[in-house]
């Protein structure tokens, strides 16, 4: 091996292999472009984005880490989402979930977690109201 040499695998690297993906149609109803990062809890994305937030609860974009999807005003696009990994605890973002998504923590399904997102998703969160 030479210093700095790359030793690559014979097979391609597949990101998020084995993660069950869903697809959603997203429309940007706003007057400005919206970017959503790779690990953002998609259900809490910008209010100008029109999509099924209940289905998106507990999911993030199926894109490489550190990248983003840009949604132009008036444009509709299809996105692939995969479940959030790790402990599946969501804090921050738009403050619509602010806690665990899984049964061990008292939430029995993504639909239950969505009950926190969907009613408040169209309104201003407590954190946004304080700002």
Curated annotation (Swiss-Prot):
Top-level enzyme category: hydrolase
Keyword presence, Phosphoprotein: no
GO BP field: urea catabolic process
Documented EC number(s): 3.5.1.5
Pathway(s) it belongs to: Nitrogen metabolism; urea degradation; CO(2) and NH(3) from urea (urease route): step 1/1
Cytoplasm recorded as keyword: yes
Gene transcribed to yield this protein: ureB
Subunit structure: Heterotrimer of UreA (gamma), UreB (beta) and UreC (alpha) subunits. Three heterotrimers associate to form the active enzyme.
Name of the protein: Urease subunit beta
Compartments in which it is found: Cytoplasm
Catalysed conversion reaction: urea + 2 H2O + H(+) = hydrogencarbonate + 2 NH4(+)
